[in-house]
Structure formats: C-alpha cells, structure tokens
C-alpha cells in the first residue's frame, strides 16, 4: 500500500522523512521555520522539493501490469526517493553571470615548487643553488687585458658619437669567446675532411702495421679520424667497423705515449698487460721474443721482459740511437741492427712469408741487402742469402739513388700536407660567420662587426694562434692530471704494500728471536734446577764443603763483573757455552783416569794386602773420589776463566772454532805432563806405613778447610814462553743454541764396560801409579793463576804438579764399587740436565 503524505517543503521532508521522528526534532524544526519566516526580506525560494511526483509514479501492489511495464525498487536507496524532487519555482531569482575586463598584471618570477617538478641529475636539488656545470658554462673563459680595455674605451667614444649604445666588458668577452670557439670547430672539421680525402684517395697509402696498400672484403682499411693512421682490420684487431667515426686506442684514450721498443712517436700502438706502457703493433710482430695475448684483438702486448739484454744493447744503424730493441738483418753473417719503424720509414725490404704449416715468418733486410734483392726474387731465398755479400759490390753505386726515391716522395707528400694546413691557419677568419654570431648572442651586427675586425687584428699579431685554449684540450689536460693522480696513488699503495711486507718480516724475525730466547732461558732454568738438586743430594750424603764451594763456583762462574774491564755480553754468552762443554768433558776425564789407575794397580799389586787388612777403607774413600772429580772439574773451569780474562786484557777475541782448538791443545799438554810425571814417579817405592799416614793427612785436609792447603811457595809452575805475537781475529757471531753440543753421551755398552773395568780394579786392590792433577782449593789456584797471567802477559800456562801433590794423589787409588756407580749416576744427571 502506498503511504499518503501531505505536500511539504524541503525542511518538512527532512523532518518527516523517517518514520522514527521525535518531539524534539519537530520542535527544533518549528523553531527553525519560525526564524526563517521572520526574516526581514520575505523572498520566495528559488527551488522546492516536490514529493507528489514521486507519489504519482508509485503503484499499488495489487495493480495488474505486465512485468515489462514497471520496475521493482529493491535497493536501500528507496527511502531517498521519498524525499522528493528538486524543482525550480522562481527563475527570476537565479543569479546571472557577469564578466569584466581586467588590466594585465606584470609577470612575476616563477618559483619552482619542490613537490610537483622533479629536478634532473645535473641540477642541484636544493633551491637557491646553481649547478657547478651550469655555472662553469656561464662563466666566460676569455679575460680582457690592458690592450682590450684601451680599445673598448676608444670604441665606446665612437659609439657615443654615432649614437649607438655603449659596449660593456662582459659582452666583449662573450663575443671574442664565441669567435674562438666557432673558428676552432670549423677549422678542425675542415682539416679532417681535407686530410681524410687526401689519404682516402691516395694510391700510395699503406697499412701502418703490415705496410700493404691492398684491402680485401672483410679486411678493410680503416682510418683514424684524429691521427689519420691507416690500418687493416686484422692488423689492428678491429672486430667490427663502426658506422660513424673511428678512433685508434691512443686517440680514444687521449694519450700520446712513446713506444717501448723504438723511438718513433705515434702510429698504430697497443698497450701492454699493465696498461701503462705502449708498443707499436709492427714492433711486436717483428721482434721474435714479443708476443700478442689475443690475436683477434691484437692486444695486449706480452713477453716484453723476455727480450734479451743483447737486443736491448743494439744500436740502430739508421737513426744511430741506442733506444728500445732493434732487429737484425736476415741475411746470413750480417749483423746490421735497425728499428722496425726506422726500416719502414726508410723503405727497407720487410717480407712476411706464410709457411706450409700456417706459420708466419718475418724476414727483414738491411739497406745493403735490400737494394739487390729485387732482381733476385726469382732465385729463391737460399741463393739470395748465399750470393748477397759478393754481388752487392757492383750495385753499390746505385744504392743511394734507390734509397732516396721513396724518401723524396714521402717528403713531397708531407710538404704538400703542411702547406694545406698552413693555408687553413692563415685563413682562420673565413671559418667565422658574423650573422650566426649576432643571432646567437642577440647583438646588433654593427657591434659584432667592430669586434670581429679587432679579433682578426689581434690574432694576426699573435701569429694566427688562438687567443684561448680549446675546451677539448683543457679537458684532455684535466683527464691527464687525473690519470697522473691515480698513477701516483697506485705507486703510493705499492710502496705501502712493500713497507707492510717489511714490517711483517721484522715482526716474524723478532718473534723468532724471542722464542729462541725463551728456549734458552728454559734450558738454563733446567740446568740450574738440576744443579740445585745435585747440591742438595751432596749435602744429604755428607760431601765436604770444598765440593759444595766447587759446585757453587760452577754455577756462578759467568756472573757479570762490575768494573771498567768487565766482559761484554757476547763474551759471557761464549763463556757459558764453553763452560758447558768443558763441564761435560771434565766429567768424563776422571772416569778415564780411574781406568788408568786401576790398570796401574793391577800391574803393581804392592798395596793389595793393605787394602784387605783395612775393610772400611773403600767406604771412607768414597767421598774422596767424588771430591777428586769435582776438584778436577773446578780446576778446568778456573783455567778457562783465567784464559778468557787474559784475552780480554790483551784485546784478543777468539772465535768459537779457535777456542775449541785451544781447549783441545791445552788438554793434550796436561795429559802429556801427567804421563811423564807418572813414568818418573812409578819407580819410587811406597811403604804401607807411608801410605796409611798420607791417607790420614789427606782425610784431615778434605774434612777441615784451610788445614790441608799447601803454601803458595811449595807449588811449582813452569810457564812456557810464547815466541809469536798476538793477532786479533775477527769474531763470527754464533747462535748460543749451536754451542750446546759439547757433551758426548756414551752408549750403554761403553757405560757397562767402564763399570766392569772399575769393579775389577777395585777387587784387585792394586797400587796406583798414575798421578792426578793438583787438588788445591779454588781460591789459592785462582790467585796463582792471576799471578801467572800478570807475569806472562795474559797467557794461562799449564802448571806442573809438585812432589807433595803427586804423593797425595797416590793415596786415592783404592775405591769401592759403590763409589763408581754413584759417580756414574752424577755424570748421567749432568748430561741429562745439559
């Protein structure tokens, strides 16, 4: 069913549009209506919203119609239809459009907004700034000098008289710069066109690499648009000929390098593998040691370092310069040298022969053999080489004429080109058009004509040279400077890399030195620990105090002395190594001496019964034997120490090998003296009472210090005289590690044999006829040695044993087996510790 509603205005439709209306809304609408009705000007509305039209369009649901005659409103927008249709009621109230003409305002400066217009890459992104390239282009490159300023002043006075506007300095600079730029561009174009046409249609033009004038399909002759060299595609490695202009490698990079193998500048050149050096392709082909990396691209030039020094030393016979690498004549027994490019310039015969195995051979001939090879071409290569020397004499008068013909033609061709270039330079003003310059700069033609005449005169005065440097040359110079900067940076990095390598080597050497020091300290610490253990064991076992003082002297023999004549650190290092070696030998010598004593005891047999009568004699003499070995070791150390001090006083420095020889010689002298004395004293008869009495005296001397010491006067020392003079020998510093190998470790079999020999000697209880070394305390021996050194100018002589010492040594011949085994253990410990 349709809903019946009263006609209402727009406000009524707004208030009654929905079924859920409230009292507050009606009250609000009534207030609003009353306010509108009470307006001072009662105007009719220009439009109303009519709902009757919508109501008339609605039909009852039971109305019979065809489905094609009506539409069913099923969308939520249905309620909006009930608000009515907007209908104008008073057309007179509609406002009429009115237009009036406004005066044109002056155009303001356009400010580019950041948001809508994007700036290009060359322009700065920030407002208020100018791009550096734009600023550089706007700056004039020509500056007025005093002559220009004076001419401008005179010209402005004439312009005032003529009623023309004055000319400022900036305008004059711009016009002169435009003249120079247009003259440079047009002249270069004319030169390239003129020379290009001349070379292209010249029948004598040849390839700069192979010197062949012929071109083939797929191997065209290409000309460089800048330096005008002509090369084949295959000769220069041009894979594809470009449609436009083509530049060679040197012109493309803007460099003018020198060839590494010849003195000629320019030409078809290719870089080496490093890219910093350049070589002519023809030089690389004709010099046998040089090769090319990629034959397709004909670059880079490689194996330049394989050229022998003999080739670098050759002097060119054509230019008389010792530069680069020259080649020699291919004729047998002819050694004439010349550069490849010099041979091409002089027109020498240079042949390229293709062998059967697709190998290319290059044959070059000197001026002497190039003149007569043309009539002999049919004879073959061998005949020409054999008959080259004798047949060259009759044709020698024709040689200068034949060699001058190509030179004259080349000189004529070069002179013609130079004349053309000079003519173009003299007519430089023809390459500038006044009308074009006036239009480009928006200046009057009269002003431009004044400046044009002044520009011609000034350039004529300057010998037709340009007033400003061309922009392209400036760019090339800038690029060259940048390249030089990069090259210097590369050199800096190379030197830095070398310095870092040196630092790395130094750190490695310092680390290795410190490791060696640490190993030396560890070994010294182990030796010191082992000596300490031995001292403790000797104290526990009850060794006399003289033995402990001997060991202390052994341990602290190389303590640095404080005084003006103190030895250096290097001498102390040598002493430590020397004493280690002496300690090892001295520990072995008492064992050998005991063998000899046992042998003498077995042979004599006079004291056998006394040893059986004294059952505790071997036990008592056990400590005496140990003290004997230690005292002999102490004496060896004292002698070596005095010898070194004497050498330091005299300023003699002996190398390691010399010290070892002196040590052996000293030991041999001691052994010889001992043998002689033992032979003399073996004939003296010994009584048992004397032996026992001497044994008791020796025991008291060993147990109580200072009682058994012999007087200095009783000791006899024979000092050998030295007839030679002392010579200072340069010392060779040796590593302390190498001087440790002074010990000789006996094998197991030798140690067992020594033990058995000592056991047999103790059981036989024979007499001892071998005399030992002096057993005086360390202090007395040191004093006597110092006196001997002062008397003999620093030499340490071998001392002879007195009779009392020989008699005391006879009492120490009988030993027990336990003493021998214990001494063997001490020797083993000292060897292991070292």
UniProtKB/Swiss-Prot annotation:
Keywords: Acetylation, Activator, Apoptosis, Cell projection, Chromosome, Cytoplasm, Cytoskeleton, Isopeptide bond, Metal-binding, Nucleus, Phosphoprotein, Repeat, Transcription, Transcription regulation, Ubl conjugation, Zinc, Zinc-finger. Residues 61-81 are annotated as: Interaction with KAT7/HBO1 and histones. It is found in: Nucleus; Chromosome; Cytoplasm; Cytoplasm, Cytoskeleton, Cilium basal body. Residues 81-189 are annotated as: Interaction with histones. GO terms for molecular function: histone H3K14 acetyltransferase activity; histone H4K12 acetyltransferase activity; histone H4K5 acetyltransferase activity; histone H4K8 acetyltransferase activity; transcription coactivator activity; zinc ion binding. One of its GO terms (cellular component) is nuclear speck. Highly expressed in kidney. Also present in liver (at protein level). Disruption phenotype: Mice are viable and fertile, and show no visible phenotype. Residues 1-46, 367-409, 589-621, 676-716, 738-819 are annotated as: Disordered. Residues 24-35 have a biased composition (Low complexity). One of its GO terms (biological process) is regulation of DNA biosynthetic process. There is a cross-link at residues 115, 573 (Glycyl lysine isopeptide (Lys-Gly) (interchain with G-Cter in SUMO2)). The modification Phosphothreonine is found at residue 93. Residues 747-768, 777-790 have a biased composition (Basic and acidic residues). The modification Phosphoserine is found at residues 90, 603, 704, 735. A zinc finger (PHD-type) spans 204-254, 314-370. A zinc finger (C2HC pre-PHD-type) spans 256-290. The keyword Cytoplasm applies. The modification N6-acetyllysine is found at residue 609. InterPro entries: Enhancer_polycomb-like_N, EPHD, Histone_Mod_Regulator, Jade-1_PHD, Zinc_finger_PHD-type_CS, Znf_FYVE_PHD, Znf_PHD, Znf_PHD-finger. Its main location: nucleus. The 2 PHD-type zinc fingers are required for transcriptional activity. Component of the HBO1 complex composed at least of ING4 or ING5, KAT7/HBO1, MEAF6, and one of JADE1, JADE2 and JADE3. Interacts with NPHP4. Scaffold subunit of some HBO1 complexes, which have a histone H4 acetyltransferase activity. Plays a key role in HBO1 complex by directing KAT7/HBO1 specificity towards histone H4 acetylation (H4K5ac, H4K8ac and H4K12ac), regulating DNA replication initiation, regulating DNA replication initiation. May also promote acetylation of nucleosomal histone H4 by KAT5. Promotes apoptosis. May act as a renal tumor suppressor. Negatively regulates canonical Wnt signaling; at least in part, cooperates with NPHP4 in this function. Belongs to the JADE family. This is Protein Jade-1. It comes from Mus musculus. The gene is Jade1.
């Amino acid at each position: 069913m349709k809903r019946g509603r009263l006609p209402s205005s727009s406000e009524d439709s707004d208030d009654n549009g929905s079924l859920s209306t409230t009292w507050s809304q009606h009250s609000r609408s009534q207030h609003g209506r009353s306010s509108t009705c009470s307006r001072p000007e009662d105007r009719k509305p220009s439009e109303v919203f009519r709902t009757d039209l919508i109501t008339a369009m609605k039909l009852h649901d039971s109305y019979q119609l065809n489905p094609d005659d009506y539409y069913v409103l099923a969308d939520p927008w249905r309620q909006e239809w009930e608000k009515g249709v907007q209908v104008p009621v008073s057309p007179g109230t509609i406002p009429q459009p009115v237009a009036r003409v406004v005066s044109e305002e002056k155009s303001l400066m356009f400010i580019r907004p950041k948001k809508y217009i994007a700036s290009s890459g060359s322009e700065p992104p920030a407002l208020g700034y100018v791009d550096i390239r734009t600023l550089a282009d706007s700056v004039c490159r020509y500056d007025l000098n005093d002559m220009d300023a004076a001419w401008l002043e005179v010209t402005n006075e004439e312009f005032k008289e003529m009623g023309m506007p004055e000319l400022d300095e900036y305008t004059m600079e711009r016009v002169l710069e435009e003249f120079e730029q247009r003259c440079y561009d047009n002249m270069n174009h004319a030169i390239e066109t003129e020379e290009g046409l001349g070379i292209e249609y010249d029948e004598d033009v040849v390839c700069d690499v192979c010197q062949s004038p012929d071109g083939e399909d797929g191997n065209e002759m290409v000309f460089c648009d800048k330096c005008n060299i002509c090369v084949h595609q295959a000769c220069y490695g041009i894979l594809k000929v470009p449609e436009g202009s083509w530049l060679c490698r040197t012109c493309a990079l803007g460099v003018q390098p020198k060839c590494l193998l010849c003195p000629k500048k320019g030409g078809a050149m290719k870089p080496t593998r490093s890219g910093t050096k350049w070589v002519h392709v023809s030089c690389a082909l004709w010099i046998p040691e040089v090769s090319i990396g990629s034959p397709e691209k004909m670059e880079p030039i490689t194996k330049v370092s394989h050229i022998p020094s003999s080739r670098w030393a050759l002097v060119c016979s054509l230019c008389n310069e010792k530069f680069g690498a020259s080649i020699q004549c291919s004729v047998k027994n002819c050694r004439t040298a010349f550069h490849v490019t010099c041979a091409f310039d002089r027109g020498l015969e240079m042949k390229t022969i293709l062998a059967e195995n697709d190998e290319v051979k290059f044959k070059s001939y000197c001026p002497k053999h190039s003149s007569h090879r043309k009539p002999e071409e049919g004879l073959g290569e061998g005949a020409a080489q054999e008959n080259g020397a004798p047949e060259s004499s009759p044709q020698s008068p024709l040689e200068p004429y034949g060699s001058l013909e190509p030179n004259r033609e080349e000189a004529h061709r070069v002179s013609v080109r130079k004349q053309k270039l000079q003519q173009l330079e003299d007519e430089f003003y023809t390459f500038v058009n006044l009308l074009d310059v006036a239009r480009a700069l928006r200046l009057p033609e009269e002003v431009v004509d004044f400046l044009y005449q002044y520009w011609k005169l000034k350039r004529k005065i300057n010998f037709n040279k340009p007033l400003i440097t061309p922009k392209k040359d400036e760019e090339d110079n800038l690029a060259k400077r940048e390249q030089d900067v990069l090259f210097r940076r590369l050199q800096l990095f190379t030197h830095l890399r070398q310095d870092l390598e040196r630092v790395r080597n130094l750190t490695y050497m310092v680390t290795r030195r410190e490791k060696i020091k640490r190993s030396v300290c560890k070994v010294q610490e182990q030796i010191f620990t082992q000596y300490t253990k031995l001292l403790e064991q000797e104290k526990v076992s009850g060794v006399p105090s003289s033995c402990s003082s001997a060991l202390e002297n052994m341990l602290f023999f190389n303590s640095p002395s404080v005084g003006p004549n103190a030895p250096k650190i290097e001498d102390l290092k040598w002493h430590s190594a020397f004493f280690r070696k002496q300690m090892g030998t001295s520990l072995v010598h008492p064992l050998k001496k005991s063998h000899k004593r046992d042998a003498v005891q077995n042979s004599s047999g006079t004291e056998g019964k006394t040893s059986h009568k004294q059952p505790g004699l071997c036990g008592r003499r056990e400590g005496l034997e140990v003290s004997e070995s230690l005292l002999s070791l102490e004496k060896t150390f004292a002698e070596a120490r005095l010898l070194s001090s004497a050498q330091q006083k005299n300023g003699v420095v002996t190398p390691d090998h010399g010290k070892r020889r002196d040590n052996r010689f000293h030991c041999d002298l001691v052994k010889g003296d001992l043998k002689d004395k033992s032979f003399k004293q073996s004939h003296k008869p010994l009584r048992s009472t004397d032996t026992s009495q001497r044994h008791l005296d020796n025991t008291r001397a060993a147990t109580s210090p200072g009682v058994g010491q012999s007087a200095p006067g009783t000791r006899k020392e024979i000092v050998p005289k030295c007839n030679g003079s002392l010579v200072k020998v340069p010392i060779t510093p040796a590593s302390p590690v190498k001087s440790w190998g002074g010990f000789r470790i006996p094998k197991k079999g030798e140690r067992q044999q020594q033990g058995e020999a000592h056991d047999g000697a103790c059981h036989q209880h024979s007499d001892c006829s071998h005399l030992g070394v002096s057993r005086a305390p360390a202090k007395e021996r040191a004093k006597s040695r110092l006196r001997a050194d002062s008397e003999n100018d620093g030499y340490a002589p071998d001392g002879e044993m007195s009779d009392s010492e020989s008699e005391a040594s006879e009492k120490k011949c009988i030993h027990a087996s336990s003493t021998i085994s214990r001494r063997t253990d001490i020797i083993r410990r000292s060897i292991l510790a070292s």
